[in-house]
Amino acid sequence: MADNEFDIDAFFSTEKKSTSSENQHCGFIAIVGRPNVGKSTLLNKILGQKISITSRKPQTTRHRIMGVDTDGDYQAIYVDTPGLHIEEKRAINRLMNRAANSSLSDVNLVFFLVDGTHWTNDDEMVLNKLQKANFPVVLCVNKVDNVQDRNEVMQHMMEMSKKMNFVDVVPISAKQGKNIDVLRKHVRDHLPKAVHHFPEEYVTDRSQRFMASEIVREKLMRFTGDELPYSVTVEIERFDYNPETDGFHINALILVERSGQKKMVIGKGGEKIKTIGREARLDMEELFGRKVYLETWVKVKSGWADDERALRSLGYIDDL
């Protein structure tokens, strides 16, 4: 096994009842929408554990991530996508849009997430793509818990329901888990009879190395300013399990584009990078169930977000 990683199912597993392949149903559900509308939060809530990072800032999700939910004969494979957005000024933005678009191929159902309070040009762009595709779509009106006036929500839902022939229009709160059961029912109704793609204990297709890099990036987004998240990425240079310490030894390289950003990440007296490292380590220990020894470095790599060769080496093109 590469990089001395444990088998992924040792860490991303749940106890499920085994089932005969004769009665199995399996299919793919794409979760799409504009940036920062709650797609990753919804996926985490459906799975009952965190596999996709979240923050208040748009475009937190950069990679296509699969979440696997197996319940008896039914296996639903959810595809969390980067938010589709109109502006494609940089190579990384173009790749994120391509990753999101490629997720719309050969799916059995689409969850289209929108905000319960307003409709944007990015929402319209996603809608146009869905109208051209031949997939059943459930419109998920998220963040309804933020709206006090019930009539306002109903009016907003009525207006949006006219935009396309949706399978259903469901008000949800991804954060609180409201109406997740309704979405699950739609999933079951659309899963074809097919052999399961993943063993029943799997919850994600992503490796521990990938999850470690995403956790560090999440902490960077939470503890730094508004400009930095779009100019930073994380590369895991070492991911080893040491039986003597019964823990993971992880080296994370944080790449920024300018020296000023490096100073921002490190912080006065190194306090910010210490906080980022500590919070990331605690999350990794909870996720992996082992002690984690995390070391972080910050390096300036000018123009990485516009360099397709660099983006390929960092795993962004693997999603396409």
From Swiss-Prot:
Residues 80-83 are annotated as: G3. One of its GO terms (biological process) is ribosomal small subunit assembly. Belongs to the TRAFAC class TrmE-Era-EngA-EngB-Septin-like GTPase superfamily. Era GTPase family. This is GTPase Era. It holds the Pfam family KH_2. Gene3D superfamilies: 3.30.300.20, P-loop containing nucleotide triphosphate hydrolases. Residues 33-40 are annotated as: G1. InterPro entries: G_ERA_dom, GTP-bd, GTPase_Era-like, KH_dom-like_a/b, KH_dom_type_2, KH_sf_prok-type, P-loop_NTPase, Small_GTP-bd. GTP binds at residues 33-40, 80-84, 142-145. It comes from Vibrio vulnificus (strain YJ016). Monomer. The lineage of its organism: Bacteria, Pseudomonadati, Pseudomonadota, Gammaproteobacteria, Vibrionales. Its main location: cytoplasm. Disulfide bonds: none annotated.
